[in-house]
Amino acid sequence: MVHATTVDVTHFPGTEPVDQLDMTATFTNNEFIELKHCEPTDSLILHGVKVSVQQGLCSATTRKSNVTIPFFTPLSPGSNLADYNGSSKEGASVDAVLRTLKRLPGTCGSYSLRVDAVNVNLAAVKRNPVAVTITLPDGSSGCLSINNALIDQ
């Protein structure tokens, strides 16, 4: 479940992918509610996360722009902060920080994610609303549509 998100899209001239995405999202893995347990394969640190941005509402069939972060590296042992600096599976240059928040009862974890990515194809994202989908390593996902994305500002 995605609770909150901010999105800042900057389009650059040239052949796609050339655009920039700056975003934050706060989300919870609610798998425990469904399965009554948390799967080890759901580790965002080990298996990363996919962020998708699209114009329209969550149910829209518009093209999604994906940034898949393959894994995160803890900043220090026991730290609730982890980062990733490198290429996404789609070839974008990514700087991302994952903060593990206090685990709420009945969930498998809550997180805050910041992603700065360049060389992303965001040509289809031209106006609000904008939908952000967070896909966990097991394929489950949550989406939130917002009406206040910053586009070319």
Report residues per predicted region.
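Extracellular glycoprotein-like low-complexity segments
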Residues: 1-153
